[in-house]
Curated annotation (Swiss-Prot):
<keyword id="KW-0433">Leucine-rich repeat</keyword>
<feature type="signal peptide">
    <location>
        <begin position="1"/>
        <end position="16"/>
    </location>
</feature>
<feature type="repeat" description="LRR 1">
    <location>
        <begin position="117"/>
        <end position="141"/>
    </location>
</feature>
<protein>
    <recommendedName>
        <fullName>Uncharacterized protein At4g06744</fullName>
    </recommendedName>
</protein>
<feature type="repeat" description="LRR 6">
    <location>
        <begin position="239"/>
        <end position="262"/>
    </location>
</feature>
<feature type="repeat" description="LRR 10">
    <location>
        <begin position="340"/>
        <end position="359"/>
    </location>
</feature>
<dbReference type="InterPro" id="IPR051582">
    <property type="entry name" value="LRR_extensin-like_regulator"/>
</dbReference>
<feature type="repeat" description="LRR 5">
    <location>
        <begin position="214"/>
        <end position="237"/>
    </location>
</feature>
<dbReference type="InterPro" id="IPR032675">
    <property type="entry name" value="LRR_dom_sf"/>
</dbReference>
<feature type="repeat" description="LRR 9">
    <location>
        <begin position="312"/>
        <end position="338"/>
    </location>
</feature>
<keyword id="KW-0964">Secreted</keyword>
<feature type="repeat" description="LRR 7">
    <location>
        <begin position="263"/>
        <end position="286"/>
    </location>
</feature>
<dbReference type="Pfam" id="PF00560">
    <property type="entry name" value="LRR_1"/>
</dbReference>
<feature type="repeat" description="LRR 3">
    <location>
        <begin position="167"/>
        <end position="188"/>
    </location>
</feature>
<feature type="repeat" description="LRR 4">
    <location>
        <begin position="189"/>
        <end position="212"/>
    </location>
</feature>
<dbReference type="InterPro" id="IPR001611">
    <property type="entry name" value="Leu-rich_rpt"/>
</dbReference>
<dbReference type="GO" id="GO:0005576">
    <property type="term" value="C:extracellular region"/>
</dbReference>
Length: 404
């Protein structure tokens, strides 16, 4: 009886496959004249073996000969594949992560590959040449918590299959050719990292649905084609953010005072957009910020003295170049002398490297649509610096543009 049991266990972990010297690939799988018996450590590995071999046959470029290691039954020794015990089963062995970062492999699609690893926790394939769309069946990968497909050739809409995957904490789809809008739910998901920069996303950013809470630490939307205003709910609810990169899009309107709620941020970059109006005084609530970039917008008014005064100890860079600011007070001049503040190419009288008088005049005579509605909101702040009243702070930030 014991011998029969051992034989049965052996057969569960084996699979009949053709000899590598004569194997052929067909739509029905692997066939060949000569067959060999491969013994696998676990049935889970036997199941993914043909998946790997099928994907291997689709690879058209392998400059580092990675796939030459994808032979035999020892899948755990294949380069790029890593095995571990699946959750809730410490005696089993499975492919827990796939890491092809920097392999420069080329394949037309990952359809039928990533979605076949039932126990996959990490999928990292940045800096390859994979194309197509992200398979919708990845929604079935219940253990997946890191997805990095950056720097490839993926196309189509935002991979909506990731929406609702409660285990996902890290999504990186940078440097691809995704387009369209992003689903509102993704901003309210339990993510720590969301990198979607350097794609072709358009439309305006959605407001965060539900209770408007989020746990995102790093949010990068840079180098897309997002337009419309900065959603107040995103700024208001993302106190956990440490890096906010919205640069080089087409955002319009004024900077909401809710930006002052990004109290955990060390880097905020909204340069290279079409934002207008004055800088909100709530910026002085950003106690941890080290780098602030608003360069290349349509901002005007005075550089707020309160911001320069209260953030001077932590600020490493405050870039306001290529705007239409008209005044810099003594505290801000101190940051200029330290090389922290950059106000080049503005409209500040008697300052070097400013716009021409004609260029400034043309900007300030434009219709009042360039002024923000509810201007008093820009003097609103909610932080521990409440001893500075809105009335006294108005001395820091004159709202009226000078005569051209």
């Amino acid at each position: 009886m014991m011998n029969h049991l051992l034989l049965a266990l052996f057969l569960v972990g084996t699979i009949a496959l053709p000899d590598r010297g004569t194997q052929q690939l067909t739509n029905d799988g692997l066939t060949g004249a000569r067959r060999e018996i491969l013994s696998f450590l676990d049935q889970r590995l036997a199941v993914v073996y043909p998946v790997i071999q099928r994907f291997k046959s689709l690879i058209t470029l392998d400059p580092y000969n990675v796939t030459k290691t994808w032979i035999g039954s020892d899948i755990c020794s294949y380069r790029g594949f890593h095995c571990d015990n699946p959750p809730h089963n410490k005696t089993a062995v499975t492919v827990a992560s796939i890491d092809f970062n920097g392999f420069q492999l080329s394949a037309p699609s990952i359809e039928g590959f990533i979605d076949q690893f039932a126990d996959l926790a990490l999928f990292h394939v940045n800096s390859n040449n994979f194309g197509g769309t992200v398979p919708s069946k990845i929604v079935n990968l219940r253990y997946l918590y890191e997805l990095d497909i950056s720097n490839n050739r993926f196309t189509g809409q935002f991979p909506t299959a990731v929406v609702g995957m409660s285990g996902l904490t890290f999504i990186d789809i940078r440097f691809n050719s995704f387009s369209g809008s992003i689903p509102p739910q993704i901003l309210g998901q339990n993510l720590e990292v969301l990198f979607i920069n350097d794609n072709g996303f358009t439309a305006s950013l959605p407001e965060i649905p539900g209770d408007g809470t989020t746990h995102i630490l790093f949010l990068t939307l840079a180098n897309n084609k997002f337009n419309g205003p900065l959603p107040r709910s995103i700024l208001r609810s993302m106190s956990t953010l440490t890096e906010v990169l919205f640069l080089n899009n087409d955002f319009t309107g004024c900077i909401p005072h809710e930006i002052g709620f990004l109290t955990g941020a060390s880097v905020i970059d909204i340069g290279g957009n079409k934002l207008t109006g004055p800088l909100p005084l709530s910026l002085m609530c950003l106690e941890k910020v080290e780098q602030l970039n608003f360069a290349g917008n349509l901002l005007f008014g005075a550089v707020p003295e309160a911001v320069c005064m209260l953030l001077r100890d932590n600020l490493v860079n405050l870039s306001l170049s290529d705007n239409y600011f008209t005044h810099v007070g003594p505290w801000c001049r101190g940051l200029l002398e330290k090389g922290v503040l950059d106000v080049g190419n503005n409209c500040i009288p008697f300052f070097p490297g400013q716009r021409s008088m004609q260029e400034c005049a043309e900007f300030f005579v434009k219709p009042k649509k360039y002024y923000c509605p509810h201007m008093w909101f820009h003097s609103f702040f909610s932080c521990r610096y409440s001893h500075i009243s809105s009335s006294s702070s108005s001395a820091f930030m004159p709202m009226v543009a000078p005569s051209p």
